[in-house]
């Protein structure tokens, strides 16, 4: 919504604006939220592609005059799809990139969640910018990819509040997906805030700030890592 991009402009936040072309792990059965990211049935393809391209155009026309938007992202993890549809995924992404360039020549087009597939079916080079979620930052195939890249989902740990700091595979202390790599732009934590989700309660509690917009312990940990501001004293068991 324009209210969101207005807020990003006002607060000085970068906005990775993304189309809702995505997939997720689970059975690739039509009718459920784990279904194939790209249609399995031929009769569904034309309508699906038309809808995705229309959403892309709407997104760009709504937000393109907002300085907080620094990239247009075509997707998130579309590799969670029926294996035989990968050619269709790649073809649609190319159409989307061309459309984004036509509607807004001033911004780059990104392929988000591009850490799979590997080998000949890679999708990370289809756009101008590649976003590698999670372990994709360290996969050999994606080192020095030849285009700008960023770690687009880093962390993904579930915690409550006040909670205990949960160090996941994205822990800054041991993750080298971006440090010292001049060809990688940085990383974005997944995620800022707890949120509603069709994935269930646990998948919705990966924020470093909870539903009530109160910081979890992880928030203070990141503040210390980036801003060198020590966290508060925490209650000790039995005290």
PLM feature spans:
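Active-site mouth of glycoside hydrolases
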Residues: 1-129, 133-147, 157-161, 169
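Generic structural signal for well-ordered alpha-helical scaffold segments
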Residues: 57-61, 175-176, 223
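Ligand-binding pocket scaffold of soluble enzyme catalytic domains
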Residues: 93, 97, 107, 147, ...
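Aromatic-rich peripheral "rim/lid" segments of glycoside hydrolase catalytic domains that contact
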Residues: 195-239
């Amino acid at each position: 919504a324009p209210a969101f991009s207005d807020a990003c402009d006002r607060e000085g936040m970068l906005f990775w604006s993304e189309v809702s072309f995505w997939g997720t792990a689970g059975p690739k059965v039509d009718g459920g939220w784990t279904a194939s990211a790209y249609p399995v049935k031929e009769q569904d393809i034309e309508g699906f592609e038309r809808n995705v391209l229309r959403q892309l155009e709407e997104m760009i026309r709504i937000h393109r005059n907002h300085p907080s938007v620094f990239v247009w992202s075509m997707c998130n993890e579309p590799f969670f799809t029926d294996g035989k549809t990968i050619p269709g995924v790649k073809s649609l992404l190319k159409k989307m990139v061309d459309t984004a360039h036509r509607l807004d020549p001033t911004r780059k087009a990104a392929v988000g969640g591009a850490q799979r597939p590997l080998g000949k079916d890679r999708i990370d080079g289809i756009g101008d910018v590649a976003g590698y979620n999670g372990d994709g930052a360290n996969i050999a195939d994606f080192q020095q990819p030849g285009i700008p890249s960023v770690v687009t989902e880093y962390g993904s740990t579930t915690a409550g509040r006040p909670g205990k700091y949960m160090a996941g595979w994205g822990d800054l202390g041991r993750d080298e997906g971006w440090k010292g790599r001049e060809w990688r732009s940085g990383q974005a934590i997944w995620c800022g805030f707890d949120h509603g989700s069709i994935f269930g309660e646990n998948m919705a509690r990966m924020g470093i700030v909870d539903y009530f917009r109160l910081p979890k312990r992880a928030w203070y940990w990141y503040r210390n890592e980036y801003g060198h501001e020590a966290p508060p004293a925490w209650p000790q068991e039995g005290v």
